Amino acid sequence: MAEHGAHFTAASVADDQPSIFEVVAQDSLMTAVRPALQHVVKVLAESNPTHYGFLWRWFDEIFTLLDLLLQQHYLSRTSASFSENFYGLKRIVMGDTHKSQRLASAGLPKQQLWKSIMFLVLLPYLKVKLEKLVSSLREEDEYSIHPPSSRWKRFYRAFLAAYPFVNMAWEGWFLVQQLRYILGKAQHHSPLLRLAGVQLGRLTVQDIQALEHKPAKASMMQQPARSVSEKINSALKKAVGGVALSLSTGLSVGVFFLQFLDWWYSSENQETIKSLTALPTPPPPVHLDYNSDSPLLPKMKTVCPLCRKTRVNDTVLATSGYVFCYRCVFHYVRSHQACPITGYPTEVQHLIKLYSPEN
């Protein structure tokens, strides 16, 4: 139950409403998990299409099914979604006169539970499918792949024209609700919570203690099933609970990993990363200590430092900037893998031929 204590903030009973930062963080948690899993599935499907291709083709449906099991598990046992429970929050039934005595371990009532599942699982699935449909219709419109019916053509063009405004109104609805929540004018940061008949609150000490002792109490009170149907029902419940528990454990570890990657690659953190991974300053190049009388360098700028003759097919080394004959420097670099003057590691691909007007 480390997730209960990781983000727990001490608060009085009268001030159990979470801050805007907590609710926005838990909203963005599952939003970050979906594309991460989608990328993993894409890599697997590209590496082995025969075995993992179906995961990519049916990713939305598989993810929705797993999300359904996960959210139902948490809502019925912790009165919160996975992300809300991760940040130490719970869902409180609106209008419940005994909400102060109701513990999170009791779970949500059936009505609020299925409403919450609908808005947590079904609505995001429909939104993803709608966005894919809009993208597909835009491609058809762009490449003039129109269906034969002109009435259908006018309909989907009107749909494409109206979709950005509908989407803007939808996002604006959520933005206004968040602003009202920040100003203390609303008890919900999301209108979907109000439609589900719940509001968010922080887990209390009693909630955390009840959640920690619930598995032990359930195992002690469990009675052996008598009939075959009861045994099958019990086995199915255990299987679903095991899948949900495995998903929650894997997601908890994955979330910490995602947050670490987000911190590591954030633009604000680049200077810190550079200071942590900075290597000691290397010594100055050897060729800077050479004077004009160095025996390694010819006195005339048109002479090759290797053959001491006028250069033919001028070729510069990208690693040092010195110019040689192509034949001389090619054989030297291929044999020694270094610059003849500075000793810098050099490969054949670092040779750059020069084409001057004199040639």
Swiss-Prot record:
CDD domains: mRING_PEX12 (cd16451). Pathway: Protein modification; protein ubiquitination. The chain crosses the membrane at residues 20-47, 52-76, 110-139, 145-183, 250-277. It is found in: Peroxisome membrane. Residues 1-19, 77-109, 184-249 are peroxisomal matrix. The keyword Membrane applies. GO terms for cellular component: cytosol; peroxisomal importomer complex; peroxisomal membrane; peroxisome. Coiled coil: none annotated. Keywords: Disease variant, Membrane, Metal-binding, Peroxisome, Peroxisome biogenesis disorder, Protein transport, Transmembrane, Transmembrane helix, Transport, Ubl conjugation pathway, Zellweger syndrome, Zinc, Zinc-finger. InterPro entries: PEX12, Pex_N, Znf_RING/FYVE/PHD. GO terms for biological process: cellular response to reactive oxygen species; peroxisome organization; proteasome-mediated ubiquitin-dependent protein catabolic process; protein import into peroxisome matrix; protein import into peroxisome matrix, receptor recycling; protein import into peroxisome matrix, substrate release; protein monoubiquitination; protein polyubiquitination. Its main location: membrane. It is linked to Peroxisome biogenesis disorder complementation group 3: A peroxisomal disorder arising from a failure of protein import into the peroxisomal membrane or matrix. The peroxisome biogenesis disorders (PBD group) are genetically heterogeneous with at least 14 distinct genetic groups as concluded from complementation studies. Include disorders are: Zellweger syndrome (ZWS), neonatal adrenoleukodystrophy (NALD), infantile Refsum disease (IRD), and classical rhizomelic chondrodysplasia punctata (RCDP). Peroxisome biogenesis disorder 3A: A fatal peroxisome biogenesis disorder belonging to the Zellweger disease spectrum and clinically characterized by severe neurologic dysfunction with profound psychomotor retardation, severe hypotonia and neonatal seizures, craniofacial abnormalities, liver dysfunction, and biochemically by the absence of peroxisomes. Additional features include cardiovascular and skeletal defects, renal cysts, ocular abnormalities, and hearing impairment. Component of the PEX2-PEX10-PEX12 retrotranslocation channel, composed of PEX2, PEX10 and PEX12. Interacts with PEX19 via its cytoplasmic domain. The three subunits of the retrotranslocation channel (PEX2, PEX10 and PEX12) coassemble in the membrane into a channel with an open 10 Angstrom pore. The RING-type zinc-fingers that catalyze PEX5 receptor ubiquitination are positioned above the pore on the cytosolic side of the complex. The RING-type zinc-finger is degenerated and only coordinates one zinc ions, preventing E3 ubiquitin-protein ligase activity. This is Peroxisome assembly protein 12. It comes from Homo sapiens (Human). The gene is PEX12.
